UniProtKB/Swiss-Prot annotation:
The lineage of its organism: Eukaryota, Metazoa, Ecdysozoa, Arthropoda, Chelicerata. Keywords: Disulfide bond, Secreted, Signal, Toxin. This is U5-lycotoxin-Ls1a. Expressed by the venom gland. It is found in: Secreted. The keyword Calcium does not apply. InterPro entries: Spider_toxin_CSTX_knottin, Spider_toxin_CSTX_Knottin_CS. Disulfide bonds join C51-C66, C65-C93, C77-C91. Residues 1-20 form the signal peptide. The keyword Signal applies.
């Protein structure tokens, strides 16, 4: 029984990681212009240099968050009401809960195997 649970958790982690990779590629395909470059890695370097780090504001560029150790950070927004009852939206790059759990399981799995 415990092997089935362990296999299920590892399977869900890998499935979540694959989904994140596919989603990142789709977002890049939709958002970026098709650019022909001599260096095939120039776009990847450009994205890495211009990405928004974890816990930084991404209100103006919601798809510009950097990659973490396994997954790309997601831009999460909240609405803030100030003392004058004016509502503003603020966004920051964070690690979603499912991704945190998946990274924890992978780290735990690495400790068990090592």
């Amino acid at each position: 029984m415990k092997y089935q649970i362990l296999f299920g958790v590892v399977f869900l982690t890998l499935l979540s990681y694959c989904y994140s990779e596919i989603e990142d590629e789709f977002e890049n395909f939709v958002d970026e212009e098709m650019v022909e470059a001599d260096d095939p890695f120039s776009l990847a370097r450009k994205d890495k240099e211009n990405c928004i780090p974890k816990h930084h504001e991404c209100t103006s560029d919601r798809h510009g968050c950097c990659r973490g150790s396994m997954f790309k950070y997601k831009c999460q927004c909240v609405k803030i009401v100030n003392a004058q009852k004016e509502e503003t939206e603020r966004c920051a790059c964070i690690t979603p809960g499912l991704h945190k759990a998946a990274e924890f399981v992978v780290q735990l799995f690495k400790k068990v195997i090592a």
